[in-house]
């Protein structure tokens, strides 16, 4: 079997043009840190339907009309995808990743913090903040 890499959401790719809007993996909306994409695809679908209805009403299906779709999607998902891209880069530092994992293995509080961030209950931005690691150090 031959496969291909999924386009991660760390880069804002063109997701529309004359007569089309791309959603989900095709639009590069895969979360760079978790690899999850279904939730982002559903967000994109919500906006694609809204913009497609507008385009149908106007009888225009050009890139200019579909630009609104791009703006809506990235307004909602851009910040989260950007943070996930930062986290992906942070994970390349094995000493930092090992430090967090070792702390999580010993501390229920750290486990809950990380779990909350991965489930979006706690802001992921905290993971890229040095104070987060200081907090873990003291846990």
Spans of features found by a protein language model:
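FAD/FMN-dependent oxidoreductases across multiple families
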Residues: 1-51, 57
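C-terminal helical "tail/cap" subdomain of flavin- and related membrane-associated enzymes
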Residues: 53-139
């Amino acid at each position: 079997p031959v496969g291909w890499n999924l386009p991660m959401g760390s880069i804002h790719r063109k997701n529309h043009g004359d007569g089309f809007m791309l959603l989900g993996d095709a639009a590069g909306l895969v979360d760079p840190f978790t690899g999850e994409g279904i939730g982002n695809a559903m967000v994109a679908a919500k906006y694609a339907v809204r913009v497609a209805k507008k385009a149908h009403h106007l009888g225009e299906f050009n890139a200019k009309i579909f630009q609104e779709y791009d703006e809506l999607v990235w307004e909602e998902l851009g910040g989260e995808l950007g943070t996930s891209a930062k986290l992906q880069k942070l994970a390349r530092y094995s000493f930092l990743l090992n430090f967090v994992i070792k702390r999580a293995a010993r501390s229920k509080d750290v486990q809950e913090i990380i779990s909350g961030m991965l489930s979006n209950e706690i802001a992921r931005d905290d993971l890229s903040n040095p104070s987060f690691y200081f907090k873990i150090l003291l846990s």
